[in-house]
Amino acid sequence: MRLFLSLPVLVVVLAMVLEGPAPAQAAPEISRTFERIPDKLKEFGNTLEDKAREVLETIKQSDIPAKTRNWFSETYNKVKEQLKTAFS
């Protein structure tokens, strides 16, 4: 039953895709596209910057860096003590 329903839907979707864009959806002039590239790149850069700042602030506010630093310090001190006792 599912196959009978999915095949016509698949055929309709495939026909729409192969038909191509409608005339109203045709690509604008290439010069307009090139004119908008710097604006799009600036917008992309701004959103990327904002997201990176949010991530960094989240990391700074969390206690993960402090816990990681403490764990490395403790592990380093343990290894150092073990080496001292082993080679003494």
Swiss-Prot record:
Domain of life: Eukaryota
UniProt keywords, alphabetically: Lipid transport, Secreted, Signal, Transport, VLDL
Signal peptide annotation: 1-26
GO cellular component entries: high-density lipoprotein particle; very-low-density lipoprotein particle
GO molecular function, one term: fatty acid binding
InterPro entries: ApoC-1_sf (IPR043081), ApoC-I (IPR006781)
GO-annotated biological processes: lipid transport; lipoprotein metabolic process; negative regulation of cholesterol transport; negative regulation of lipid catabolic process; negative regulation of very-low-density lipoprotein particle clearance; triglyceride metabolic process; very-low-density lipoprotein particle clearance
Record Pfam families: ApoC-I
Main location: secreted
Subcellular location: Secreted
Family that this chain belongs to: Belongs to the apolipoprotein C1 family.
Function, as annotated: Inhibitor of lipoprotein binding to the low density lipoprotein (LDL) receptor, LDL receptor-related protein, and very low density lipoprotein (VLDL) receptor. Associates with high density lipoproteins (HDL) and the triacylglycerol-rich lipoproteins in the plasma and makes up about 10% of the protein of the VLDL and 2% of that of HDL. Appears to interfere directly with fatty acid uptake and is also the major plasma inhibitor of cholesteryl ester transfer protein (CETP). Binds free fatty acids and reduces their intracellular esterification.
Protein name: Apolipoprotein C-I
Origin organism lineage: Eukaryota, Metazoa, Chordata, Craniata, Vertebrata
